[in-house]
Amino acid sequence: FGNKHPRDIDSAGLGDWVVNPKKLPDGIAGLLRDAAKHNIGFGIWIEPEMINTRSELYEKHPDWVMKVPGQDFITARGGTQAVLDLTNPQVRDFIFYTVDTLLARYPEIEYIKWDANMPVLNHGSVHLDKDEQSHLSILYHQGFEDVCRRIRRKYPDVTIQACASGGGRVN
């Protein structure tokens, strides 16, 4: 994934969920075709809650990362990874749109492994009012549940497995 900032290393391209034709000249359709040829169900591993500061998504929406208002934020994994702010409805819509586009375009996808490979290091949101900051964890989780419900409602037969040991998540 990623074209302007290809995901060749873990410090670039996360959040840019577009196929890189240099890596996959036949795109996801080519992978699906090969899987079908060998009678293998196809699954895809994505990390839609995370972003690299070296990504087109961050260049367009730097305000979408979780951070304490008025402060610099902490990055991890290659010095550029951050967590998208699911308290923000625009972020939730983007994540849903990303997954929806993938599944609508490639209905043969049977399985998603949903990674959240980074802990929340920045306990704040530029989207929330001052009096809502203490509810950040609850509101983030409610935002995550909202996205999952929307995906499940539209794609009830797709298996989705959460994977977050790197993020230390237990939800």
Predicted regions and their residues:
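Active-site beta-loop-alpha junctions enriched in small/polar residues
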Residues: 1-2, 47-51, 116-119, 163-167
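Aromatic-lined carbohydrate-binding/catalytic grooves of carbohydrate-active enzymes
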Residues: 1-97, 106, 110-111
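Alpha-helix-loop-beta-strand connector modules within alpha/beta enzyme cores
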Residues: 26-35, 136-155
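A structural signal for isolated positions on well-ordered beta-strands in alpha/beta enzyme cores
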Residues: 43, 159-161
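Substrate-binding cleft/loops of secretory-pathway carbohydrate-active enzymes
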Residues: 52-61, 161-171
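Short acidic (Asp/Glu) and glycine-rich catalytic loops that position anionic groups and cofactors
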Residues: 74-79, 125-130, 154
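P-loop NTPase motor core
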Residues: 104-106, 111-146, 158, 165
